[in-house]
A protein has these predicted regions:
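HotDog/MaoC-like acyl-thioester-processing domains
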Residues: 3-19, 23-27, 86, 91-93, ...
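Catalytic strand-loop segment that frames the active site of acyl-thioester-processing enzymes
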Residues: 4-64
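A broad, structural micro-motif
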Residues: 42, 77-79, 123
């Protein structure tokens, strides 16, 4: 027990990960001091980091193991394009949710719509194109099983 705070084994054994609500993946995070500038406002590039974490968590949630694909030489996702609008600022200690949804699924890429939100306020609105590449950087068809999982999410959610 930390002074005045009861801790369960769950707090140490199972890190929180995001999850799906229908077709949307929700990833929770808190703004820490390292994320902010001297005014306590989140530095603009950190929103891209938040969205990257959410995309990685979304892939894990549907059973896609990026590390295993990399180790096996199958390929990797790399961001090919980002279109982002900054609408409002997050501040130190804010609790945020990154909401991600699959917008377009192509043979060698996927477009993901991502919003960073504080409660009901949209702070950023982005569309991220992630290309699937060989280990030497050439476009490659995504594994069929992965495409099928993405399509199932778009059709029926999780």
């Amino acid at each position: 027990m930390v002074k005045g705070v009861a801790m369960t084994s769950l707090a140490f054994d199972t890190p929180y990960r995001g999850g799906f609500s229908g077709r949307e993946h929700h990833f929770a995070l808190t703004v820490y001091f390292e994320d902010t500038d001297t005014a306590g406002i989140v530095y603009y590039a950190n929103y891209l980091k938040y969205m990257e974490r959410a995309r990685s968590d979304m892939l894990r949630a549907v059973g896609i193991d990026q590390r295993a694909a990399l180790d096996a030489g199958e390929g990797v996702y790399a961001v090919a394009e980002v279109a982002i609008r900054y609408l409002n600022s997050a501040r130190l200690n804010d609790d945020l949710i990154v909401v991600s949804s699959l917008e377009t699924i192509r043979a060698a890429s996927v477009i993901i719509h991502q919003r960073v939100m504080r409660r009901t306020d949209i702070l950023t609105d982005a569309r991220v194109t992630a290309a699937f590449l060989t280990l030497d950087g050439r476009p490659k068809r995504q594994p069929t099983e992965w495409v099928d999982r993405f399509r199932a999410i778009n059709e029926q959610g999780i």
